[in-house]
Amino acid sequence: MFTKPIIFVSFITIPIVSLFSAPKYILFGWEFGQTKLHELIEKAPYFDTLPIDGIGITPLTGQKDAIGRPMWSRYLMHTGPWQHEDVKPLVEDFRRLTSHKSMKECFFGKFFSSPTNRIAWTDDAVWARIGQNMRVLARLAKEGGVRGFGIDHEDYFRQEQFRHRRSDGDYAKTASLVRKRARQLFSGVFAEHPTAVIITFWLLSQEEIYFGEVDPVVTMRDRGDLWPAFINGIFDVMPPTAKFVDGDEKSYRYRADRGDFERAYVQQRTKAIRLVAPENRQKYMTLASMAFSVYLDMYLANEGDEWYQPPLNGSQLERLRDNLRGASFASDEYVWFWGQAHCWAKWPEKRRFNGHFKQEDFKRTWEECMNGLIDTIAQVKDPQAYGFKLWEESKKRGALKVMNRNSACLDDARKKKALPSPYAYWQDTYRRDTNGVFRIDSTFGEGDTSSICVEGVSHGSVILPIKGVQSGDWYAVEFSAFGEGVSGDVGWYKNSKWYKASGKVAVVFEDGVAKDSWRKARGVFRVPTGADGFGLIMGVHLMPGEKCHLDNVFVYKLEKEGVEK
């Protein structure tokens, strides 16, 4: 689960899009621009086994326009005009594709992209044709269950579509016209697909040059930048049911251990908004979602390469894990992956490939190149779901390893303190008026006649310490409680002292069980980097005269099948 604090900018509250849900992971890459629609449908069951929610698709459909030119988003800027009847036969195929759980968050890639030849902003006919094509694909997306559209306006063909030229005329008038064109294009899109999500590899996150300026509008004019005007035009016509996602492509280079993702999130919210017209700022705050990216090729690169992420604890996969964790924590809803040299799936025929890579590269999957990648992504995406699934699988194959002594909370005549080994206890007598009692009750227990009894402790805990663990190992804990005022969590040790560099993990009680009966609390977790032990903390918060009982305390080490040590 990923949460973040609510930030206040002036008087506007930033909405948290997915406060209590796992992030949505979207795959983009060269392989998906070379794939036929029927191939995607055939591979969808395989993608269902991956911890993903969708892909950016520009599949080859085989559809042609009236004069035989390919009809798909990558050709949208320079073909058409298209008609809905031209793509209507594809609706059922897209419904089949998006019926899969791994395809619920698919995006039409290259929906609006940089043109191969610069288009005059004054050319009404061309912009009308492009708008018609976009509207046709928007309707197809809505009817086919596709979540939305990808915008990639990077200037691959060096046409400077969003850079003002003197031949355009006055900058202010041109910027106004650009904003009008965006309204013209996207009013039709939202009319056909009012709940569309527009994901951009960058919305305003790349405009850092303006963030420190006293008057960014003046700087935009001096630089001839027309992109913010286009974005404002989209916001002009965006309904409250739609969403804009800033993918922050420069986050390829971010490092979680430097706090880069959190810094970028705050910067996007507090600085980028100055590039948004005042009348659209409320829309920006409520409809714009912040996302971050993972560039897979960087984790296979060699030191000295332009695109490179250094290893963490000797492993580039661990660096990917840490950065993915940072991206997932800081994003509002989406994290997207970009890959070039390899593929997620084995495809049935040779793919076209960029000259930077060998054809052989495309025969290897990312998992083959980074063993454990898919499992790592699953762990980061939803640690609780992953851990509980691993726990259940271990139970089924009888592989649970109990790591603690005295789970039954039996008395020990040799004990020198109120509770027997290995249990410790604590109450805050320094800052609170508490003077309760910890003891073994040999007359009452869950399934037997022994348990730990706590009486009158207003703020304290019973602690089960576990030492000698390794970072990256998975554990499960459970205990039973009778009575009110009991909570559970796990904290970390380093060199036998509390280690607070990583946050605690909650151990949660099952719902729907009366507090005048035994209740079970459970938790799962991965040991964080730097920790060499942990403590299961069974917290107690009792009123005078109240008591509670604790029993059946278990700590299990969890390991995937085939890797038990």
Where are these regions (language model features)?
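Short, solvent-exposed coil/turn linker segments
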Residues: 15-16, 36, 70-71, 83, ...
